[in-house]
Amino acid sequence: MAEITSAKAMARTVRVSPRKTRLVLDLIRGKNVADAIAILKFTPNKAARVIEKTLNSAIANAENNFGLEKANLVVSETFANEGPTMKRFRPRAKGSASPINKRTTHVTVVVSEK
């Protein structure tokens, strides 16, 4: 049986737009996990907090479930898929209303050994 060299973590239905989340994910894809955490710490973005927690979860999964070394881990895959959209309405002039879409995101982070 082949040895497992990667671990995954997901954050589902996060109240951040997928488009804004992808901008942050592009910064850490392919980086060493220590560098990725440092980048996320200094990124002034709501999505960065969520991605940092998900990345730490993936690292913990790799260490505890598969016995991988944190020093050897790289962020191999990251993606943000669209979750369910909460539809709201904003009252406007003359009794009309405009739709407001509050988007959510499913964030996935995969770490693997170099």
Curated annotation (Swiss-Prot):
One GO BP annotation of this record: translation
GO cellular-component term (any): cytosolic large ribosomal subunit
* The keyword Lipid biosynthesis appears for this protein: no
Query: Cross-referenced InterPro entries, in alphabetical order?
Result: Ribosomal_uL22 (IPR001063), Ribosomal_uL22_bac/chlpt-type (IPR005727), Ribosomal_uL22_bac/org-type (IPR047867), Ribosomal_uL22_CS (IPR018260), Ribosomal_uL22_sf (IPR036394)
Q: Say yes or no: keyword Glycoprotein present.
A: no
Q: Name one GO molecular function term.
A: structural constituent of ribosome
**Which Pfam family, giving just one, matches this sequence?**
Ribosomal_L22
SUPFAM superfamilies linked: Ribosomal protein L22 (SSF54843)
Q: What keywords appear on the UniProt entry?
A: Ribonucleoprotein, Ribosomal protein, RNA-binding, rRNA-binding
Q: Which HAMAP family match?
A: Ribosomal_uL22_B
What is the documented function of this protein?
Answer: This protein binds specifically to 23S rRNA; its binding is stimulated by other ribosomal proteins, e.g. L4, L17, and L20. It is important during the early stages of 50S assembly. It makes multiple contacts with different domains of the 23S rRNA in the assembled 50S subunit and ribosome.
NCBIfam families, alphabetized: rplV_bact
PANTHER family reported for this sequence: CHLOROPLAST 50S RIBOSOMAL PROTEIN L22-RELATED, LARGE RIBOSOMAL SUBUNIT PROTEIN UL22M
Assembly with partners or alone: Part of the 50S ribosomal subunit.
Please state which protein family the record places this protein in.
Answer: Belongs to the universal ribosomal protein uL22 family.
UniProt protein name: Large ribosomal subunit protein uL22
